[in-house]
Structures are given as structure tokens and as C-alpha cells.
């Protein structure tokens, strides 16, 4: 009896937690130029932009954490894209980036401006354009 009661309480807690989760927001489809022209409008929002990979850098931190950064080039305008992990993209690939845009973000002593965080844990992704 006691085991069933405990199991019932655990089940209710799980259902309650699942009900509180919000679905991932639909990203705002925009352009690199629009992000650069009006960064306040998109700050901390999920965006989707298309462009070409330029200045690709795949690194591993001293702590062993892999990351990828590149410039997303579209119509002569560029914006930085960051993601944890080594992405399967190459220089000059045409890609679709979904991620959280930051007008300005501080990480430790560094400040990053006009950057998209496309990390999967942030709900982001980078995929090759079909």
C-alpha cells in the first residue's frame, strides 16, 4: 500500500512538471541586415537567419569543452554565430541558423556584440540549406 502511494505521488509530480514546460518559441525569420539595423528589437529573442559560413573556428577550451564560431555572411553583412560542440559545417556552406540573438552579452571578462547563440541547449541549431 505504501509503495503504491509513493508511486502515485511521484507520478503526480512528473505530470505536474511536464505540464509546466513551455513549448519552444517559434523563431522570428529575419535577415542579418535587419538584426544589425535594429538589434534592440531582437535582443534575447529566438531568430532564424540564412547565410554563408565565413571565418569558421572550431575550438576546445582548456576544460575540454568544444565550441564553434563563425561569421554568417548575407548580402555583405556579417554577424557572429556561436554554438557549443563542433558543428558539421564547412567554410562557404550555405546554412540556416536558429538561435537566441544577443545585442550584447558578457561572459567572464569578455563582451560579445551582435551574436547568435545557436547552441542546442538554448533551442538553437545550424543546418545546411537544401
Residue positions per predicted region:
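Bacterial N-terminal signal peptides
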Residues: 6-16
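OB-fold and OB-like single-stranded nucleic-acid-recognition modules
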Residues: 19-130
Amino acid at each position: 500500500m505504501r509503495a503504491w502511494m509513493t508511486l502515485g505521488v511521484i507520478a503526480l509530480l512528473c505530470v505536474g512538471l511536464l505540464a509546466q514546460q513551455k513549448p519552444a518559441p517559434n523563431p522570428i525569420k529575419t535577415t542579418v541586415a535587419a538584426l544589425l539595423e535594429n538589434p534592440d528589437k531582437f535582443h534575447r529573442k529566438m531568430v532564424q537567419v540564412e547565410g554563408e559560413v565565413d571565418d569558421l573556428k572550431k575550438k576546445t577550451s582548456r576544460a575540454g569543452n568544444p565550441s564553434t564560431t563563425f561569421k554568417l555572411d548575407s548580402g555583405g553583412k556579417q554577424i557572429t554565430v556561436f554554438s557549443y560542440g563542433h558543428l558539421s559545417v564547412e567554410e562557404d556552406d550555405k546554412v540556416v541558423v536558429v538561435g537566441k540573438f544577443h545585442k550584447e552579452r558578457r561572459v567572464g571578462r569578455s563582451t560579445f556584440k551582435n551574436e547568435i547563440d545557436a547552441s542546442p541547449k538554448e533551442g538553437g541549431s545550424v543546418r545546411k540549406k537544401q
